[in-house]
From Swiss-Prot:
This is IMP-specific 5'-nucleotidase 1. It comes from Aspergillus fumigatus (strain ATCC MYA-4609 / CBS 101355 / FGSC A1100 / Af293) (Neosartorya fumigata). Pfam families: ISN1. Its EC number is 3.1.3.99. Allosterically activated by ATP. ATP binding is a prerequisite to magnesium and substrate binding. ATP binds to 2 of the subunits in the homotetramer inducing a closure of these 2 subunits and the release of the C-terminal loop, thereby activating the enzyme. Keywords: ATP-binding, Hydrolase, Magnesium, Metal-binding, Nucleotide metabolism, Nucleotide-binding.
Length: 450
C-alpha cells in the first residue's frame, strides 16, 4: 500500500518546468507531478529493466500484473484522499455508522477543509465538483497505453493527465450526469489559428451530444463583435448543425458561442446567414458582471496596453498592438514566430503589472499566451462558462465539463475554467475526439449496467 512510502510534497517538485493539472473545483490544483512521484516507487521496485526475459514470457506477464496492482493501489489511495477531502455528491452516512473508522471524513462538507490529509500533502487542493474514480480510470487507460508493461519508461505526465480525464468522465457519467460541455477553440477543436472545417472529426461527436440534449458552448478568446467572424472560424460545425435532419430546433438552440472569454454571446440561429445571432448582455450577464463599468474597463486596458508596449520594447519583439472593445494584445506584424519564453515573459509582466493596479484588484481579467501572441481580456473563462450555465437556465458546475488545452497557471486561459466546472485537459483535436468517444463508451456501459 502507498502508506509504506514516505510522501514529501515539497520535494516532489521537479527542478525543471513545473506542470500542474487543474481538476474540478474552486481552487483545486492537483499536482500531476505529485502523483508521478508516487508511481515512481513501484516502477523502480518492480519494473525489472535489467532482467533478461523474452518480451512475451510468463515472467514478464507476472511482473506486469504485479506492477499493475501496485499502480492501482496508489490510484485507489489517492481516490480515497480526495473522497476524504471533498465528496460533494455522497449522501450523509447513517447515524449508526457515523463513527466507523473507514468512513470518509469529508472535511469540505464538514467545514474543515484545511484539516484533510490531502490538504496537508497538497496545500493547493480545493473542493471538487464530482468524484474521481481514479482506480477504475487507471485500469481503463492501462489497458490502452500498457503503462504497467513498460520496463524502461515510467508513468509519464501524459499518462496521468489522460487518467485524470478518464476519471472525470467516469465521475460525471456515474454521478450527476452531463448537461453542458464547453470547448476551447484553438488546438481543442482545430489547429492553432485554423478554422473548424466540414471534415473535422469533432463535428459528428458534438452533434451526438446535442442530440442527447446536452448543451454546447464554444468558449473562445477570439473577441469578435459580429457573428460573421465566428462563422468564418466555425463554419463547418455551424453548417452541419443547420443542415442536420436529426436535430430538433430545440436541440439546435443548445449551441452557443462565447467570445472574448466572457464578453460576447451568440446563439445558434438557423435563419441567420451566419448561423448566429447576438445575445444582448442583459440576457446572460451574471449579477457580479453588472458592476463592471466602462471607466474601469478602459483604465485596465490602458494599463495593460502600456505594459505590453514596454515589454515589447524591452524584449525587442516585432509586434503590433491591437486594441479591441474589451481586450488588448500584441501580435507579430510580419507573421514571424515569437519564442515561447518571450511570450511567457510578456504574459507574466503584464499580469503582474495589472494585478498590482487598483483597478486590477476589482475587475477580473485574463492575460494569456495565444501561441504566437499575447492578449489581455476583461473577465476570463470561468465567467464565460458560468454565463453559459446561466443562459441555459442555471446548469450546475457538477453537470458541466470544460474541455481545453491551456491549464498551466501562467499564460493559460483555460486555467480559470476549473473555478466554474469540471475540466478535461487535452493536447490536440485528436485527444478531444478520443475524449468524446470515451464519453460515449462510458455512457453506453452505464446504461447497460443500469
Amino acid at each position: 500500500m502507498t502508506t509504506r512510502y514516505r510522501v514529501e510534497f515539497a520535494s516532489s517538485r521537479p527542478t525543471g518546468k513545473f506542470f500542474t493539472a487543474r481538476l474540478n473545483g474552486q481552487t483545486n490544483i492537483f499536482q500531476i507531478e505529485w502523483i508521478k512521484g508516487l508511481l515512481a516507487v513501484p516502477f523502480v521496485l518492480h519494473s525489472q529493466p535489467t532482467a533478461v526475459y523474452q518480451e512475451h514470457s510468463e515472467n514478464l506477464v507476472a511482473v506486469a500484473a504485479d506492477t499493475h496492482q501496485r499502480y492501482a493501489e496508489i490510484f485507489r489511495d489517492v481516490e480515497k484522499l480526495i473522497d476524504d477531502h471533498s465528496r460533494p455528491l455522497a449522501p450523509p452516512p447513517p447515524p449508526v455508522l457515523a463513527s466507523h473508522l473507514t468512513l470518509s471524513v469529508d472535511h469540505e462538507r464538514n467545514a474543515a477543509p484545511g484539516k484533510s490529509k490531502l490538504k496537508l500533502l497538497v496545500p493547493t487542493a480545493g473542493s471538487f465538483f464530482s468524484r474521481l474514480p481514479l482506480e477504475d480510470a487507471f485500469k481503463y487507460q492501462d489497458a490502452k497505453r500498457m503503462i504497467s508493461r513498460r520496463r524502461f519508461v515510467a508513468p509519464s505526465f501524459n499518462d496521468i493527465r489522460l487518467t485524470l480525464n478518464t476519471a472525470q468522465l467516469l465521475g460525471l457519467v456515474r454521478g450527476p450526469g452531463l448537461d453542458l460541455v464547453t470547448f476551447d477553440g484553438d488546438v481543442t477543436l482545430y489547429d492553432d489559428g485554423a478554422c473548424l472545417t466540414p471534415d473535422n472529426p469533432a463535428i459528428p461527436r458534438i452533434i451526438r451530444l446535442l442530440h442527447q440534449g446536452v448543451r454546447i458552448g464554444i468558449v473562445t478568446a477570439a473577441g469578435y463583435t459580429e457573428g460573421a467572424k465566428y462563422y468564418e472560424r466555425l463554419k463547418g460545425l455551424l453548417d452541419a448543425v443547420h443542415d442536420s435532419s436529426s436535430l430538433t430546433p430545440a436541440q439546435k438552440d443548445g449551441l452557443v458561442v462565447m467570445g472574448g472569454e466572457s464578453n460576447f454571446l451568440f446563439r445558434f440561429d438557423s435563419a441567420s446567414p451566419h448561423r448566429l445571432s447576438y445575445v444582448p448582455r442583459p440576457e446572460w450577464l451574471l449579477d457580479e458582471m453588472k458592476s463592471w463599468n466602462q471607466e474601469d474597463i478602459t483604465q485596465l486596458l490602458d494599463i495593460a496596453e502600456s505594459s505590453l508596449r514596454a515589454c515589447a520594447a524591452n524584449l525587442n519583439l516585432p509586434v503590433a498592438v491591437l486594441r479591441k472593445d474589451r481586450a488588448v494584445g500584441v501580435y507579430p506584424y510580419d507573421r514571424s514566430k515569437i519564442h515561447r519564453e518571450q511570450l511567457e515573459e510578456t504574459v507574466l509582466v503584464v499580469q503582474n503589472t495589472v494585478e498590482r493596479s487598483v483597478v486590477g484588484s476589482r475587475l477580473p481579467f485574463c492575460a494569456f499566451n495565444g501561441g504566437n501572441d499575447v492578449f489581455v481580456d476583461i473577465g476570463d473563462k470561468s465567467w464565460g462558462v458560468r454565463a453559459c450555465q446561466r443562459y441555459f437556465g442555471g446548469i450546475e458546475p457538477s453537470r458541466t465539463l470544460h474541455v481545453g488545452d491551456q491549464f498551466l497557471s501562467a499564460g493559460a486561459n483555460d486555467f480559470k475554467a476549473r473555478l466554474a466546472s469540471t475540466t478535461a485537459w487535452i493536447a490536440s483535436l485528436t485527444e478531444t475526439v478520443q475524449l468524446l468517444d470515451e464519453l460515449e463508451e462510458m455512457q453506453k456501459a452505464e446504461k447497460n449496467r443500469s
